[in-house]
């Protein structure tokens, strides 16, 4: 695990590969760069691959929320862009899972020149967002803000977090989310739990579960100018595939929407044998197309440039 300093905070990341297009992998809520452990080395055979821990997660720092950094998609999107500039030192493909997709989309909208393309795996639909709750009948929409307010009380929120941060609870949640239960291992449970024991982890968790504002994927997708590949585990109980398909149906930048039968919310961990070749082949194809567009008269000119 390597470290990078960002705005005075420690950011952990992993790296594999020394040649080829740059690819930055972004984990989901409560996870870390280790959630890409089945992808990093394989993709590193053809790419320069980086998997980073977002601020507040994994082995990255967990500063007190809003002092001064807030745990929002704008913050994380800027973290990824600065990582591309300072560590990758150039444009990169961004691959995300769950809320990592929103982070990738935010980065691509904020600075289109920094992002070569997006690979979105079971994008978070943010179904508990304030704007989405407004469309519900009042008796269905009122429950979430009440619970969020209660969790803001330390005497309630902290025991709630501690009750979740237990091996049996994490194992049960993963088995609900994963279509392939054999991918739920003791190793997976342990590396997801380990950061929860660090100072600040409770505050990060409670800040995010109370965060029902900010961008929705349907806000960001129409603003993206780079090509997009979407992979979706068909058995995801949290982000239903029909809603995912509808989300991207009218987005011209989405080149492919690929259902993954029998796979749940985390395809990169459940089915790396499916995900890795698709990510590799598509990003290499996009990189070659971009190179040809820059140097339309052949390799000789490209080599002299």
For the regions a protein language model found, what residue spans apply to each?
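Helix-loop "lid/cap" segments that line or gate small-molecule binding pockets
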Residues: 158-183, 192-195, 207-212
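Flexible "cap/lid" loop of the alpha/beta hydrolase fold
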Residues: 109, 116-157
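Catalytic active-site module of serine/aspartate enzymes centered on a nucleophile-bearing elbow/loop
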Residues: 253-305
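Serine-hydrolase catalytic-loop signature spanning alpha/beta hydrolases and amidase-signature enzymes
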Residues: 28-38, 49
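Active-site glycine-rich loops that stabilize anionic/oxyanionic intermediates
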Residues: 20, 28-31, 98
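Short beta-strand/loop motif that positions the catalytic acidic residue
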Residues: 224, 230-232
């Amino acid at each position: 695990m390597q470290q990078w300093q960002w705005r005075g905070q420690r950011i952990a990341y992993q790296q594999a590969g020394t040649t080829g297009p740059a690819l930055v992998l972004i984990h989901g809520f409560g996870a870390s760069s280790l959630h890409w452990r089945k992808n990093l080395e394989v993709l590193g055979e053809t790419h320069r691959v980086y998997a980073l821990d977002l601020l507040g997660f994994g082995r990255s720092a967990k500063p007190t929320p809003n002092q001064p950094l807030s745990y929002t998609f704008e913050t994380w999107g800027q973290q990824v862009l600065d990582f591309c500039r300072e560590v990758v030192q150039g444009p990169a493909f961004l691959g995300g899972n769950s809320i990592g997709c929103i982070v990738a989309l935010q980065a691509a909208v904020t600075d289109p020149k920094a992002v070569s393309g997006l690979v979105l795996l079971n994008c978070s639909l943010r179904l508990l967002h304030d704007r989405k709750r407004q469309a519900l009948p009042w008796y269905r929409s009122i429950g979430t803000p009440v619970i969020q307010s209660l969790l803001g009380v330390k005497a309630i929120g902290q025991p709630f977090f501690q009750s979740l941060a237990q091996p049996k609870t994490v194992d049960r949640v993963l088995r609900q989310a994963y279509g392939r239960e054999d991918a739920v291992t003791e190793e997976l449970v342990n590396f997801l739990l380990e950061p929860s024991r660090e100072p600040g982890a409770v505050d990060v968790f409670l800040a995010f579960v109370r965060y029902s504002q900010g961008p929705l994927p349907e806000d960001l997708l129409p603003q993206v100018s780079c090509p997009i590949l979407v992979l979706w585990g068909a058995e995801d109980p949290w982000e239903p595939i029909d809603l995912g398909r509808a989300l991207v149906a009218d987005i011209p930048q989405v080149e492919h929407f690929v259902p993954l039968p029998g796979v749940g919310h985390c395809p990169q961990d459940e089915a790396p044998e499916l995900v890795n070749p698709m990510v590799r082949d598509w990003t290499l194809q996009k990189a070659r197309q971009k190179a040809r567009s820059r140097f339309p008269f052949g390799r000789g000119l490209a080599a002299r440039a």
